[in-house]
Structure formats: C-alpha cells, structure tokens
Swiss-Prot record:
Gene name per UniProt: rpl10e
GO terms for MF: structural constituent of ribosome
A Pfam short name: Ribosomal_L16
Keywords, ordered alphabetically: Ribonucleoprotein, Ribosomal protein
UniProt protein name: Large ribosomal subunit protein uL16
Example GO BP: translation
GO cellular component: ribonucleoprotein complex; ribosome
Record family assignment: Belongs to the universal ribosomal protein uL16 family.
Length: 170
C-alpha cells in the first residue's frame, strides 16, 4: 500500500477527528516511548524544540524524529546525562478515500460516492510555538543537545526553532 504525501495532511484545515470509540481499524501509534534517558535525576537546564507554524505531525514523523534525537544524545552524552520528553500525542485520525488504479479500475472504482475514507494513521495537531520535544540536562552539554534537536527537527513538516531555559533556584 502506497503512503500518501504528508502535504495532504499537514494543514489544520478541518476539525479534529479523534473519537476512536466510533471507528474501527485504526492503525496503532508508532511512537514507542515518550520519556527516554535518565528519568529520576533533576537537571538544571531544558532545551525545547518548538514548531513555528500550526500543523499536523504524523506519528511516523514523530517516531523518526524521536529515534534520531535519542540515538544522537545517547551516543554523545550517555544514557544517564539527559532526559528526553516527547510532549505531544497523535490523537487525530487520518482518513483516505482509496482509489483503484490500473486496467479496469473504472468498473471497480466508486469514484467520489461514499467518499468518507478509511483510517490510515494518526497525527498530532500542533499549534504555533508549541513545544514538541524537550531535553533536560546540564549546561555543559548544550551544544550537543542543540545539534541533536536540530537533526530531529528536519524530520518534522514545520520549520522549528530551539528554546533554552534554566530552572530557577528556590
């Protein structure tokens, strides 16, 4: 089965379609982990990957970005020196009206009759300036974290930027 290009699903044109109790046959979410690295330690700094535009991010794109960022951080810093958090969940169900192609397709195809479509995947609906990934770590490793998040941001459909915040001492 051919996957449609992301440009078909990128924009927030329609309402969210999330009521899974009314639907059948929704593919599972590909995102495996939402928290990675050292989950117990408190770190003084956080670096976040933020989307510049409102968009829908497919679950496969979130998983690809997560794997890229986590692999780079694990290799550069070691598993105990960071905490990576994915801050969004793909609730929105994507639909596609399948079209028959090839010889004799016009006899089999329904065209636009009953064109509601079947569920083909899920996506996270993100607003402008929403944090997608956050890495908690020490200030000494900020350059390596920025590099890893920049690489992961290339796998997302919207332009991104980084926000660095230090936790307040109380």
């Amino acid at each position: 089965m051919v996957r449609k290009p992301n440009s078909m699903y990128r924009n927030l044109a329609k309402k969210a379609y999330t009521r899974k109790e009314y639907m059948g046959g929704i593919p599972g979410v590909k995102v495996v982990h939402f928290d990675m690295g050292n989950l117990t330690s408190e770190f003084p700094m956080e670096v976040s990957l933020v989307v510049d535009e409102s968009c829908q991010i497919r679950h496969s794109a979130l998983e690809a970005a997560r794997m890229s960022i986590n692999r780079k951080l694990n290799k550069e810093l070691g598993r105990m020196n960071y905490h990576l958090k994915l801050r969004t969940y793909p609730h929105h169900v994507l639909r596609e009206n399948k079209q028959a192609t090839g010889a004799g397709a016009d006899r089999v195809s329904q065209g636009m009759r009953l064109a509601f479509g079947k569920a083909v995947g899920t996506a996270a609906r993100c607003q402008q300036n929403q944090k997608i990934f956050t890495v908690f770590s020490n200030p000494a490793s900020v350059e390596k974290i920025k590099d890893a998040l920049r690489h992961g941001g290339h796998k997302l459909p919207s332009p991104t930027h980084l926000v660095i915040e230090m936790k307040q001492e109380s």
